Amino acid sequence: MRAIFLILCSVLLNGCLGMPESVKPVSDFELNNYLGKWYEVARLDHSFERGLSQVTAEYRVRNDGGISVLNRGYSEEKGEWKEAEGKAYFVNGSTDGYLKVSFFGPFYGSYVVFELDRENYSYAFVSGPNTEYLWLLSRTPTVERGILDKFIEMSKERGFDTNRLIYVQQQ
């Protein structure tokens, strides 16, 4: 089961480095502030996360200078946790919120932080290589309505179909 989850992640992100024209990565990104556990509050649906609740992502520094990624979610249908372990590296330098992430071999996809609470790193708006990939991450299982509204507005302005957002159940 885990192997299928990893393969799906990789196939869908295979060779997808780039970002929507309307999306620009944050500058002055501070990796040490970004490390740790994040809760997925909202996302656009994809087969590799379909049906998952209680989704989290955890980021840690790797020995090679990259970032280890551990995505985890619960499948109610199967009554089990699914995990995907990956690695990420900066594309343009460590102060730019633009990374490439891989969950399978040499295949990488874009991970673009386009909005961020710069003071506390309490939330992040993240895009993939195109407007089909979008996430709202938070240090807490839920966010204030104002942050959610900002996420929806900024995402809509950048061409994401916010009517298709899935709000992740976190317990």
Curated annotation (Swiss-Prot):
Covalently attached lipid (S-diacylglycerol cysteine), positions: 16
Major location category of this protein: membrane
Lipid attachment locations (N-palmitoyl cysteine): 16
Record localization: Cell outer membrane
Keywords for the protein's UniProt record, in alphabetical order: Cell outer membrane, Lipid-binding, Lipoprotein, Membrane, Palmitate, Signal
Membrane topology recorded in Swiss-Prot or TrEMBL: Lipid-anchor
GO MF annotation terms: lipid binding
Record Pfam families: Lipocalin_2
Signal peptide: 1-15
One annotated GO biological process: response to stress
Superkingdom of the source species: Bacteria
GO cellular component terms, A-Z: cell outer membrane
Family per record: Belongs to the calycin superfamily. Lipocalin family.
Subunit structure: Homodimer.
Protein task: Involved in the storage or transport of lipids necessary for membrane maintenance under stressful conditions. Displays a binding preference for lysophospholipids.
Protein name as annotated: Outer membrane lipoprotein Blc
Organism of this sequence: Vibrio cholerae serotype O1 (strain ATCC 39315 / El Tor Inaba N16961)
